[in-house]
Amino acid sequence: MNRVPAPVLALAAMISVQLGAAVAKTRFDDVGPVGAATLRLVIGAVVLALLVRPRVRHWTRAQWLGAVGLGLALGGMNVFIYVAFASIPIGVAVTIEFLGPLALSLVHTRRWRDVTWAVLALAGVVLLGVGPTAVTAVGGVVFAVLAAGCWAGYIVMNRHVGAAIPGVDGLAVSMLVAMVVSLPFGLRSAVDGVVREPVLLAVFGAVAVLSSVLPYALEMLALRRMPTRVFGVLQSLGPAIAALAGLAILHEGLAPLEIVALVCVTAASVGVTLSARRARGSGRGGTDPVPS
């Protein structure tokens, strides 16, 4: 891995995430979108807990509240985006979801120049709003917006948990919380699907690796060898990679307006990331980059 360029590792992490999403969608007919999200969360949470074995005996009330809040955001983000995938193309859903962290960055900006990126992102939203997906699958768009809100909440809570809890213990506990949150909604369909087709355990085990374990490892390796500014810009390619994964695996094409919207949101994300890094380098306050 040391010979692989860091940008390649970062791109591989994003490709892995979107491939996992596309593979999961191929089995929605067997377990439903919520059942699929539940299986992914259960397998991912159990594997992470076994690897990390979080030490929670001496946690304070504030640490517990932070981990639970992070878990709620994580669970909502996973369930809502999978429900969105069921009715709209992955590329469109991820573009809408990206508006969560992008809006969070823009809300905290203190520079007028970032209004340009806000307008560009708004243009993307408007184009998505008048595109064919929004007209024919309003429910999917709504769930993607909910996922965007959860992603923004996840970022806020992740900063708090990262500062309050050392290592990845907080993440391991939050994954367990996300799993518990999903169980009342997806357990029955997940169990019914696995009983009919036990191979689904292997499929969603692979999804958990592609969507969680492998990207996390690749991102850690990449961040050790590249500036976070460059990493943030590469992360902004997420919607485009999602669209390509949807096209390659699910044969999901995007309408011209949706492609333009994707480009607008991606460009706004790149702009916010670069602007924030320049501001930090000059000692001024700035926005936070769009996270992975």
What annotation goes with each model-predicted range?
Residues M1-A12, A45-G69, V107-T116, T133-V138, ...:
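Membrane-interface interhelical linkers
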Residues M1-G35, L72, G76-F80, A123, ...:
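Glycine-/small-residue-enriched transmembrane alpha-helix faces in small-molecule transporters
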Residues A6, D30-G76, A103-L104, C150-M157, ...:
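Transmembrane alpha-helices of multi-pass small-molecule transport proteins
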Residues V8, A12, T38-I43, G69, ...:
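Hydrophobic residues within alpha-helical transmembrane segments
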Residues L11-L19, V23, L51, V68-V83, ...:
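Hydrophobic alpha-helical transmembrane segments of multi-pass membrane transport proteins
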Residues R27, A36, R40, A84, ...:
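Hydrophobic/aromatic residues within transmembrane alpha-helices
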Residues V42-V47, I96-V107, V177-V181, L234-I249, ...:
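Alpha-helical transmembrane segments of compact multi-pass small-molecule transporters, enriched
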Residues L99, R113-P132, A245-L247, L257-A276:
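Hydrophobic transmembrane alpha-helices of multi-pass small-molecule transport proteins
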